[in-house]
Curated annotation (Swiss-Prot):
Annotated family: Belongs to the MnmG family.
Gene Ontology molecular function, alphabetical: flavin adenine dinucleotide binding
Name used for this protein in its record: tRNA uridine 5-carboxymethylaminomethyl modification enzyme MnmG
Residues annotated as binding NAD(+): 273-287
Keywords annotated in UniProt: Cytoplasm, FAD, Flavoprotein, NAD, tRNA processing
Organism: Salmonella schwarzengrund (strain CVM19633)
Broad class of where this protein is predominantly found: cytoplasm
Cofactor: FAD
Residues the record lists as binding FAD: 13-18, 125, 180, 370
Localisation per UniProt entry: Cytoplasm
Subunit structure: Homodimer. Heterotetramer of two MnmE and two MnmG subunits.
Stored Gene3D superfamilies: FAD/NAD(P)-binding domain (3.50.50.60), GidA associated domain, C-terminal subdomain (1.10.150.570), tRNA uridine 5-carboxymethylaminomethyl modification enzyme MnmG/GidA (1.10.10.1800)
Length: 629
């Protein structure tokens, strides 16, 4: 039977991608349905209890700048906040927070249940309704059919999921949850390229059985960082430390002596695992010269005794897991409350997607999250928001939107996936971005919130706060530009105490702030340049914009030069055999990838600068040289 009301957008899956997709589509005014196999696990952290990190924190800030949910949720659930790379330049600084799993899940569910235009329904989806290469709905396990103009698949590791502990395995979407086998079979019938990936998680430890007195503590930062541009530290719950232990030669001997019982090394697991979050078996074998590896003992919550040992993800048998855990300092009497495991699952080649994350072959069908070959909550959330907003735009008969690589880490993520694809779980790093000085955490709102407002993602409260911040930045910069001090002035003596070389000529506040030894806080503590802005976010922007002005201007020039060709469009129907002068290898790769632009084509392995020049000349001769807006 059909459900009585049609929807504009259906989201299948309630993880980090699905919840952002649902919120985005609903915020844009579209009637949205979120289908999940279990309402109680909406926003569940399936692996590590943390949000953010290098590259990942940048994505969270961008999701927040576009009105998303993740940053707000972690501000309400974070039990330890830190700035990573704090001593380095602003481009690579990143926020990370330990999370209370229960509080995080509660924050996500509360937001979803209070979002207008959004209905949540508990039923596993087993089929899609596809008519003439267009998706028009979904069918649940009890045969209930829902119609919609667009469907977003955010099913994580559930598609034909198989859990491995030692040489034993069983079907599962994650520990304690069933897999999605009928939907996996249905998707394999569609003209989509599918393969298998693998990820894993460590055993969870009972905190009462760990001797923390012999371990080093790791505390959060003070003052506490905040994730959301709309948040403040008063929202944070109680803060707690993490602890650090290490593997040792005994640990490594246990692992080496039991490799024949590892499903990965025994050839039972075929899927490729994440390069940058390897299992402890992989670390011991790949880095044989290391006699220890650092392990972070992270609390799972304020009301839980479970500890997440970050760094010992494993699929070895349970008895071996016990030996590994008890070989480490402070863990000699530790008890495991949940075994570690590996999970294999289906993923679909993201090269079959448009930059909007819509399928190139099934109109109205969008993919987001681990189903696209990524790993991590943050990568999933960013894709979910993009897929949700584009599903909403499609249902409203509007053109899709995707950020450029020079505009957002989300743009880098999507371009990498859709252009290059991936053969292993993809993780975001700042090193993946060519223009990372422009793509900082601190300016995510300056880059994206105005666009978010145009798209209908940003509400009035966020828009008002954003404009107030812009005004504060502009007003303060003008004040510093117009406030001067001369070497002979009485205030010069106070200024000189903060300078490595005393003033020799008249200087404005901005001139002084450009000096490497002068911070904004120091400058505004001086009588001549007081008071400091109360708006801490605006104050940070003033300091960064002034200190890095020359570097930022230079990178902006590089971006503009690159964009002249980057945005030159390539016809979707172009057969590259028509372009004389291209090698057979280049023709094959371009016909296989079908890049949407010259920029995408230039990032395909094997497509040379000479081939790009030939393409540009050919497009010009054919009168097909046009650029996207």
């Amino acid at each position: 039977m059909f459900y009585q009301d049609p929807f504009d957008v259906i989201i299948i899956g309630g993880g980090h991608a699905g919840t952002e997709a649902a919120m985005a589509a609903a915020r844009m005014g579209q009637q949205t349905l979120l289908l999940t196999h279990n309402i109680d696990t909406l926003g569940q952290m399936s692996c590590n209890p943390a949000i953010g990190g290098i590259g990942k924190g940048h994505l969270v800030k961008e999701v927040d700048a576009l009105g998303g949910l993740m940053a707000k949720a972690i501000d309400q659930a974070g039990i330890q906040f830190r700035i990573l790379n704090a001593s380095k330049g602003p481009a690579v600084r990143a926020t990370r927070a330990q999370a209370d799993r229960v509080l995080y899940r509660q924050a996500v569910r509360t937001a979803l249940e209070n979002q207008p235009n959004l209905m949540i329904f508990q039923q596993a989806v087993e089929d899609l309704i596809v008519e003439n290469d267009r998706v028009v709905g979904a069918v649940t396990q009890m045969g209930l059919k829902f119609r919609a103009k667009a469907v977003v698949l955010t099913v994580g590791t559930f598609l034909d999921g198989k859990i491995h502990i030692g040489l034993d395995n069983y079907s599962g979407g994650r520990a304690g949850d069933p897999p999605s086998i009928p939907l996996s079979r249905r998707l394999r019938e569609l003209p989509l390229r599918v393969s298998r990936l693998k990820t894993g998680t460590p055993p969870r430890i009972d905190a009462r059985t760990i001797d923390f007195s012999v371990l080093a503590q790791q505390h959060g930062d003070n003052p506490m960082p905040v994730f959301s541009f709309m948040g403040n530290a008063s929202q944070h719950p109680q803060q707690v430390p993490c602890y650090i232990t290490h593997t040792n030669e005994k640990t490594h001997d246990v692992i080496r002596n039991n490799l024949d019982r590892s499903p990965m090394y025994a050839g039972v697991i075929e899927g490729i695992g994440p390069r940058y979050c390897p299992s402890i078996e992989d670390k011991v074998m790949r880095f044989a010269d290391r006699n220890q590896h650092q392990i972070f003992l992270e609390p799972e919550g304020l009301t839980s005794n479970e500890i997440y040992p970050n760094g010992i993800s494993t699929s070895l048998p349970f008895d071996v897991q016990m030996q590994i855990v008890r070989s480490m300092q402070g863990m000699e009497n530790a008890k495991i409350v949940r075994p570690g495991y590996a999970i294999e699952y289906d993923f679909f080649d993201p090269r079959d997607l448009k930059p909007t994350l819509e399928s190139k072959f099934i109109h109205g069908l969008f993919f987001a999250g681990q189903i696209n070959g990524t790993t991590g909550y943050e990568e999933a959330a960013a894709q979910g928001l993009l897929a949700g907003l584009n599903a909403a735009r499609l249902s409203a008969d509007k053109e899709g939107w995707a950020p450029a690589r020079s505009q957002a880490y989300l743009g880098v993520l999507v371009d990498d996936l859709c252009t290059l694809g991936t053969k292993e779980p993809y993780r975001m790093f700042t090193s993946r971005a060519e223009y990372r000085l422009m793509l900082r955490e601190d300016n995510a709102d300056l880059r994206l919130t105005e666009m978010g407002r145009e798209l209908g993602l940003v509400d009035d409260e966020r828009w008002a706060r954003f404009n107030e911040k812009l005004e504060n930045i502009e007003r303060e910069r003008q004040r510093l530009k117009s406030t001067w001090v001369t070497p002979s002035a009485e205030s010069a003596d106070e200024v000189n105490t903060h300078l490595t070389t005393p003033l020799s000529r008249e200087a404005s506040g901005e001139d002084l702030l450009r000096r490497p030894e002068m911070t904004y806080a120091q400058l505004t503590s001086l009588a001549a340049f007081a008071p400091a802005l109360e708006d801490e976010q605006a104050a940070e922007q003033v300091e960064i914009q002034v200190k890095y002005e020359g570097y930022i201007a230079r990178q902006q020039d590089e971006i503009e030069k690159q964009l002249r060709n980057e945005n030159t469009l390539l016809p979707a129907t172009l057969d590259y055999r028509q372009v004389s002068g291209l090698s057979n290898e280049v023709i094959a790769k371009l016909n296989d990838h079908k890049p949407a632009s010259i920029g995408q084509a230039s990032r395909i392995s094997g497509v040379t600068p000479a081939a790009i020049s030939i393409l540009l000349v050919w497009l010009k001769k054919q009168g097909m040289l046009r650029r996207s807006a």
